[in-house]
């Protein structure tokens, strides 16, 4: 039994009745607490009454704290409205709304420098509520229950800039909020035009996703347009994605419905850095350097780093060792990222590097040019691994099955 209205086992029927009784005190505060709504929370917690009740009560608190009932009338700041990519466009064959996330042109760093994380998260909450409102309207229009959405993730242009740690952490907060407060609303998620970096990016966000959500993700191959047309009618799919829908002015991307983002002009910036915690702090003596080694076992891994110095600049470069087991000078190693001086005492530095071959990579903080001052450097370095299942999926031509 699926645990949905009209397909409940006697045990599930009993659980639903008991659940309604247990949470009857909070039901009047919720927009539409019908059986469909209550079953979403039960399915999300495998019909465990205690866990389902705890989840729903936490959601009621969330709605109160974030003033969710009035969120649709709230207007996000101008920079978010103009540059946060994505949008709702059309319906799938069952009448469920379709939401597009456009990853490539998203300027994550620019958004976090121009808007507060709270406003960005609030905008995503507002999007969720607008989608639920659209489901209610579709239910009335079609005369059948619509309670889920289809998502299309356009990953063309996904790059190292999108792996910036504060951006990934902010996106993780949104995914956690979505999982905790909008359970069982995702019907399926299509990933299209995924580049080689996708398995690394997916591995970063996977911990924030429930098993159920992961099963609904379909990474599509070269035939992605054909696959989308099996789920969405051509007149409901933009020309850009293989359908026939255009804007009134003929634009094939349907830009009146989908925001395609873009680089944010610096005049919007309200800060030039995001506060970060660092895992290590070292003192680099005058006239010397400090090396940190990381073993990379296979190609495609990504090194991600952030660092800051105190009082003065510091040199930084990345090298690949040519001999194992012994410390090597910079000149004896293969230079991967050229050494240069960074004003990291003024603005913290961050970066990423895709490792094209296995070996021992050395991140070197250079103070050899300073004969007077030692440098205090705080840093965090991580090795980001690709998700193997996603990688295998992408290696299969036209992979289009849930992982």
From Swiss-Prot:
This is SEC14-like protein 2. The gene is Sec14l2. PANTHER family: SEC14 RELATED PROTEIN, SEC14-LIKE PROTEIN 2. Residues 76-249 form the CRAL-TRIO domain. One of its GO terms (cellular component) is cytosol. Keywords: Activator, Cytoplasm, Lipid-binding, Nucleus, Transcription, Transcription regulation, Transport. Residues 275-383 form the GOLD domain. Its main location: cytoplasm. Monomer. Carrier protein. Binds to some hydrophobic molecules and promotes their transfer between the different cellular sites. Binds with high affinity to alpha-tocopherol. Also binds with a weaker affinity to other tocopherols and to tocotrienols. May have a transcriptional activatory activity via its association with alpha-tocopherol. Probably recognizes and binds some squalene structure, suggesting that it may regulate cholesterol biosynthesis by increasing the transfer of squalene to a metabolic active pool in the cell. It is found in: Cytoplasm; Nucleus. GO terms for molecular function: lipid binding.
